[in-house]
Design a protein with these regions (language model features):
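A polyampholytic, Gly/Pro-enriched intrinsically disordered region
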Residues: 146-157
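A polyanion-binding, active-site-adjacent surface
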Residues: 2-105, 111-116, 120, 124-138, ...
Length: 157
């Protein structure tokens, strides 16, 4: 199995207040070259509900609400989009990313991202684990995801 390198840059600027970290982009996200691109992933739907707006330009939405997006993993082996299959992990330099920003809190989307963050990343910013919005976590109702992610909206104020 060959190593796959994360194919696109973080969404971040100096005014970012929160950083949302996934594990590694899905096959569809890698093809579409942006975060949470699989239409079955509920991340963007949750954001629309929390911020009470339709999101047409995802990157502009993130900048407008001071949200940075990235993934913990810089490169890895992976089968399809399954976090369970991830191996040979190299992590992104998250501490350097947030140096010249207003980021005061980091959220991870799912257990794998949180576990890898805790294991590999040395950063003084508080981190909060949130449930995965992936279709692999379909048992979690949309209302429950929105409730769990409310802290993101509150942290963007």
């Amino acid at each position: 199995m060959s190593i796959i390198t994360h194919p696109f840059p973080p969404v971040v600027d100096s005014h970012s207040k929160v950083l949302i970290l996934g594990s590694f982009p899905s096959v569809i996200s890698r093809r579409q070259n942006f975060y949470y691109a699989n239409r079955n992933n509920r991340f963007w739907k949750v954001m629309e509900i929390l911020f009470d707006e339709t999101i047409n330009d995802k990157e502009a939405f993130c900048h407008a609400h001071h949200i940075a997006l990235w993934d913990v993993i810089a490169s890895c082996t992976i089968t399809g989009s399954s976090d369970a299959s991830i191996g040979n992990v190299s992590v992104n330099d998250i501490a350097s990313l947030i140096e010249n920003t207003d980021i005061k809190i980091i959220f991870t989307t799912g257990k794998k991202a949180y576990h890898l963050y805790q294991k590999h990343v040395k950063c003084d910013v508080p981190v909060v684990s949130l449930p995965s919005t992936s279709s692999a976590n379909a048992a979690m109702h949309l209302d429950d995801l929105v409730a769990a992610y409310r802290i993101v909206e509150e942290s963007c104020q």
